[in-house]
Amino acid sequence: NPDTIAELEKRLYTPLSNTLGAASCSGIFFGLNVTANTSLPNAEDFRAGLYLRYSGLQPTVASEQDVICFRGAAETARSLQLQMHNRWNPELNAALIPGSDQVTAYQGSRLADGCLWTKRTELPDTWEQVMLLCVPILDGGGTVRGFCGAEISDLYFSLSHNIVPSAFGNILTLAAPIDGDSLLLSGAMLGAADGSRLTANGILHISDGKYYTTYSDGKNTYLGRHQLLDSATWDGIPLAAVTLVPDGTFRSYEKGSQIAWFL
């Protein structure tokens, strides 16, 4: 019933909006195992729900950001006086969210065990790149009724993780899937990378050293460290927090230090 769905979305707007304002993310969403699009051939992929995002992100506090409706019933957006995204749709398409089927098939009782991240992926119907955290929604009896989660966009991550100047060179920050000895840049979120050649493409091969780790694609080399997180992507690859310094700037510092010591 579309009216019932819209009423439920309106009731859940306040906790969703409050979470968006308090959490470190660029969007927040939920999708229930129900749809108003029952006549469509792929109706099983659609989830009624609400997806709120920041629009025109600026390096400022959450309370000063504009919130728009990316997914949700038109009646919900109108009644809440929410601006609708120019790529708005009334429902979420679960088929376009990697791993959402695994989340909704979860049979445990501990929510943290049912959480999954996507790698860096294109937000449906937009040019933006995001990582999505998906969490199962359980009812009082422990049955999964859908999924909810948070979005981290590439712009949000970049604004939130600026370059950190140091004597060794500018320190860069990443959130990246690491598969064995390979850091998967194509699935990573990059902080501000001004002045470096680091892009979200390709693979950095990892070599452990005594004091630091080397990351290289054969042309560009970085020195740094990474810490595996208690999280994995939908296909089971661990996520890591990574800090890098371009090898060239570190070698310049090293050479300068040796000259100063000699003098």
Regions found by a protein language model. Give the residues of each.
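Tryptophan-centric aromatic hotspots in well-structured domains and transmembrane helices
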Residues: 27-40, 103-121, 237, 250
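Solvent-exposed loop/turn segments at secondary-structure junctions
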Residues: 35-37, 124, 152-156
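Extracytoplasmic/periplasmic ligand-binding sensor regions of membrane-associated signaling proteins
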Residues: 67-149
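Extracellular/periplasmic juxtamembrane segments that couple receptor/chemosensory ectodomains to their
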Residues: 128-131, 138-139, 143-146, 150, ...
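Short, solvent-exposed loop/turn segments that connect beta-strands within catalytic domains
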Residues: 37-41, 110, 124-127, 139-143, ...
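Extracytoplasmic/periplasmic sensory segments of membrane signal-transduction proteins
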Residues: 1-104
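Hydrophobic segments of polytopic membrane proteins
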Residues: 118-119, 174-178, 208-209
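Solvent-exposed, extracytoplasmic
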Residues: 11-16, 143, 147-190
